[in-house]
Amino acid sequence: MKAGVFKTKEEVTSDIVKEQLVSVKELTTLKYRYTNVVSFENDNEFYGMKIPFTTKKFIISYDGEVSAGIDLDKAKVDINDEKKAINISLPQAKILSHQIDEDSLTIFDEKESIFNQLKIKDFSEFRKNEMKKTEQELLEKGFLEEASKKSKDAIIEILNINPLIKDEYTVKVN
């Protein structure tokens, strides 16, 4: 029997392409590392006036990292064999994670009053607010738009690993 007599035709289907993408799940395409030095101050008030000797405050430094990308479970794949085209619709990029490195926390100044003591709740709420503020600043600077652009480029690279796709199909990502 000659080799190649029963040669099978390889073909690209939307299921194969979708499986190749979904196996990745989440695609992180952009990371932002930062260091912040921020202060917290709180006084007890009585009818809008600060009460003396009730100030609590701290100054803290920390490192953080924000990751953005896309959820590939929500990608839609359409293959046109006649035109040899693969069209992929991606969801909008989103912030996938935001973490503060607990080992990087440094407290420079800490002051509390016997009448207004620092509590873990103060730090916890402060941390949440600072994280939201950082995320908002990134959104205003186009962080997610950049993550979307990099996601599109990464998807094309991932699919072009398959020689059949690279040689025979045009990949378009929306």
Description of each model-found segment:
Residues 1-174:
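Domain-level marker for long, solvent-exposed, non-transmembrane regions
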